[in-house]
Each structure stands twice: as C-alpha cells, then as structure tokens.
C-alpha cells in the first residue's frame, strides 16, 4: 500500500480536555449571560489575563507544598528564552499580578471578575477535567467582613437566578498567621501521636502542610481528624470579631450556613474567612464554588500590603447541576431561513438576507453543500431542521413580481393547521417579518 493510500490515523482531543459542541454551547451561553448580568449588578469589572504565566507566580502565590504546585501544574521551559512557564491552574494569582503590574490600585479598591479556562494535570472524572473553566471575582482593597459577606451573597443570588437548589454554604476562619502557627504546633503534636495510622498522603503532609490533613477524604482517618485541635479555638480577638461580623451579616440577609472547622482550602494564600458552596448531587466532586480572604497575597507577589477576598466556581460543575435539575433552557432557532431557486433568485436572496440582518433579525441563507443548487424540497427540509420561525422563499415568480413568499415554520394557526404561506412585496418584507415575530412571541406567552 502506498503512503498516499494508507488511511491516516484519526486525531482526537487530549483526554480530559473537552470540546464544547454547538448542541452544548447554548447552555454555556445561558450561564455566561446570567453570571455577567449578576456581576454588573454588583459593580464588578471584567479583567482578562493570559493563559500562560511565569511559573514562580504560582509557586510563590499558591504555595510550593500544595497539591497544585507539587503534582498538577502543566509547566514547561520556553525553548526561545529558557523561561519557566505554566498554564494557569487558577486565576487569583494572575489577577493580583496584573493589578500590581498595572498599578490598578493607585486610586482605590477594585472589584474585578474573570472567566476562562484553567489547567491541572490530574485524573479526569465527572466534574474534574484537565482543562476546566472558572468564573471568579476578586475584591481588592476591602478589609472588612462586609466584603466577605457580599461575595458570599453574590453566589446565593446566582443560585437563585439559575434556579438551582440544594447548594449549601460552609464557612470557617483560618485566622491570622500567628494563630495558624500556634495551631500548627499543636496539630503536629496531635498527628504525631497517630502517625502509625496516617495514610501516605497524610504522612507526606504532616510536617509540610499539616492543615491539609484535616481535609482528607480517607474514611479511615475521619475519627482522627474529627478529634484534632481546631483552628477556630486558636483565634484571637481580631479574627473572632471578623468572623462574627461575617456571621451577623449572613444571618441578617437570610443566608443559611454551617461552620465547618475542617474547611481549610487547598491554597496557601488564604487567611481569616474561607467558604465553600457544596452539593451532594455531584458525587465526590461536591464543591461548586469556593473562596475567602487572602490579605497576604498582594504583598507576597510584590505589591503594597492590601486586603483582598474573592471566589471561583467551576462552570462545568454548575452546568452538570443544571442538567441534573432539568434547568437547561430550550435553544431558540434563528428568525428566518432564506430559500432560493435559480441564479436571479440567489442574487435577490443575498440582498434581502443582508437587509434583514441590518434590522437585527437572525438569518440563515441557504448555501449549497456540493456547489450545485439544491432542490426546493431539500432546502425546505433544511429550513425546518434549522428551527427558524419563518422561511422566506425566492423563485422565478417572486423575482419577476418583486415579492417573497413567507412560510411560518413554527406552531399552528387558530384552526390547528400550519399557518399558510403568504406573498409579501420585498419592500414590505422587513416590516412584515418583524410584526409576525412579535405576534408569534405574544401567542407563545398566552
């Protein structure tokens, strides 16, 4: 068999990095439109950072002994200049880097939001992918518990806007650095007493990041973790006042919550408030949004000491919930599908289609698949399949008479039959279609 005749191997996407196909894109667009409207209502501004950042941004910002930095980052050396680069595994550090680099905080606090793909090298499973998408907010320059409460309440409002139920809020306080240090000493002492019962992961974290042992999912360690010293018992007056202030605001705004003393988060930059929104509808991957306060991070990345808080949520997980609860909106078709037969009709169809688009109507103009003109019957099948509200038809008679034939494709008339085809002068076509679209929408509301 010659090289030319040998069948080429079919190329596929990278495992854990998924295509978003047209039949799924409508749900993504619905979520994105909903969340963007919400963020505008809270005065947040969009920021877009590169997918690739210098690796030290994450090792310094997230923490060298976190799972993300140790095991999950896609890092490489740039062949052009030898720089160590990484596909972003999260976006808080990148937003902070941008705020520092562009001196964004010189005139006061900023409310920022982002949306886009993140990358982590881990085993793909439901709700956890190697390329995944997050939307997140960063409130930079706000020190009080009121900012914490506001970003938590934003999530609550989003669940309501989407129609989601059964997502529960868990909160905790990680206190200040000196309080965590005192707790760390006692926690290590306690875990050392049970060292023979710890699994490999807990053994590895015992002296590098013992707080993360409290977050273990291993059933065999749950009793040990349950009886471990609680960080909340080491909080000083400032930390307690902050945490109590958050709780008062949440209660005043009817936001139910549970205090979870084991909630520690997987990133080293957090202090004081941490929170997660969790559900039992996604199996082991139950966290759909998480965040908290990260006051040390801006100084840690080279900026002036600045308070900050934020959250991120996994879009794929939220879309899974929308499907689980049958909240997927019906995708609407275009307004008009233009059908034509003959060269003169095709020219007229092009002109009219552009004119209709000028008025804001969504229009598909039939184009042949094989370069030859398709039959009227096959074009009408395509028009029906497109989900369009109306077919606008041009043939020899229509071109000669300066008209278009308009056929409704959705619904039925008052007699239960499909609405009849009408001949409309071309100069009146736009007005006719707009009025017909309004009438169709009103009928649908009845």
From Swiss-Prot:
EC number(s) from the headed UniProt entry: 6.1.1.21
GO molecular function: ATP binding; histidine-tRNA ligase activity
Stretches for region Disordered: 403-422
Subcellular location: Cytoplasm
Catalytic reactions on record: tRNA(His) + L-histidine + ATP = L-histidyl-tRNA(His) + AMP + diphosphate + H(+)
SUPFAM superfamilies in the record: Class II aaRS ABD-related, Class II aaRS and biotin synthetases
Transmembrane regions listed in the UniProt entry: none
GO cellular component, as recorded: cytoplasm
Entry keywords, A to Z: Aminoacyl-tRNA synthetase, ATP-binding, Cytoplasm, Ligase, Nucleotide-binding, Protein biosynthesis
InterPro entries (alphabetical): aa-tRNA-synth_II (IPR006195), aa-tRNA-synth_II/BPL/LPL (IPR045864), Anticodon-bd (IPR004154), Anticodon-bd_dom_sf (IPR036621), His-tRNA-ligase (IPR015807), HisRS-like_core (IPR041715), HisRS/HisZ (IPR004516), HisRS_anticodon (IPR033656)
GO aspect biological process, one term: histidyl-tRNA aminoacylation
Listed CDD domains: HisRS-like_core, HisRS_anticodon
Broad EC category: ligase
Family assignment from sequence similarity: Belongs to the class-II aminoacyl-tRNA synthetase family.
Subunit details: Homodimer.
Name the record gives this protein: Histidine--tRNA ligase
Organism from which the protein derives: Burkholderia thailandensis (strain ATCC 700388 / DSM 13276 / CCUG 48851 / CIP 106301 / E264)
Gene: hisS
């Amino acid at each position: 068999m010659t090289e030319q005749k040998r069948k080429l191997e079919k190329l596929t996407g990278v495992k854990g990095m998924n295509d978003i196909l047209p039949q799924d894109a409508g749900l993504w667009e619905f979520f994105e439109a909903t969340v963007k409207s919400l963020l505008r209502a809270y005065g947040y501004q969009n920021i877009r950072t590169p997918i690739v950042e210098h690796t030290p941004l994450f090792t310094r910002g997230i923490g060298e002994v976190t799972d993300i930095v140790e095991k999950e980052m896609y890092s490489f050396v740039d062949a052009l200049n030898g720089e160590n680069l990484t596909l972003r595994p999260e976006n808080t550090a990148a937003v902070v880097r941008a705020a520092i680099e562009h001196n964004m905080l010189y005139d006061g606090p900023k409310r920022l939001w982002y949306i886009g793909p993140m990358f982590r090298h881990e085993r793909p499973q439901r709700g956890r992918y190697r390329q995944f998408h997050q939307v997140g907010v960063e409130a930079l320059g706000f020190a009080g518990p009121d900012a914490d409460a506001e970003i938590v309440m934003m999530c609550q409002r989003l669940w309501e806007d989407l129609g989601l139920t059964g997502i529960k809020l868990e909160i905790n306080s990680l206190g200040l650095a000196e309080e965590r240090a005192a707790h760390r000493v006692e926690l290590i002492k306690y875990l050392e007493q049970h060292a023979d019962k710890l699994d490999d992961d807990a053994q590895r974290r015992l002296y590098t990041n013992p707080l993360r042992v409290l977050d273990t999912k291993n059933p065999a360690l749950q009793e040990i973790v349950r009886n471990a010293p609680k960080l909340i018992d080491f909080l000083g007056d400032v930390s307690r006042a902050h945490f109590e202030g958050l709780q008062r605001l949440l209660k005043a705004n009817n936001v139910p919550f549970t205090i979870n003393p084991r909630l520690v988060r997987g990133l080293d930059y957090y202090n004081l408030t941490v929170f997660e929104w969790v559900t039992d509808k996604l199996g082991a991957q139950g966290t759909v949004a998480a965040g908290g306060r990260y006051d040390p991070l801006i100084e840690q990345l080279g900026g002036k000491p600045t308070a900050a808080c934020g959250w991120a949520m996994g879009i794929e997980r939220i879309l899974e919930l929308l499907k689980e609860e049958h909240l997927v909106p019906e995708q609407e078709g275009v307004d008009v599908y233009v059908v034509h037969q003959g060269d003169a009709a095709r020219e007229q169809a092009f002109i009219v289609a552009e004119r209709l688009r000028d008025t804001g109507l969504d229009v598909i103009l039939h184009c042949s698949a094989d370069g030859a003109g398709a039959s009227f019957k096959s074009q009408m099948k395509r028009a029906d399949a497109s989900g369009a509200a109306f077919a606008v038809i041009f043939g020899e008679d229509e071109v000669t008479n300066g008209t278009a034939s308009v056929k409704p494709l959705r619904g039925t008339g008052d007699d239960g039959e499909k609405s009849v085809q009408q001949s409309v002068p071309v100069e009146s076509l736009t007005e006719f279609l707009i009025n017909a679209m309004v009438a169709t929408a009103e009928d649908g509301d009845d």
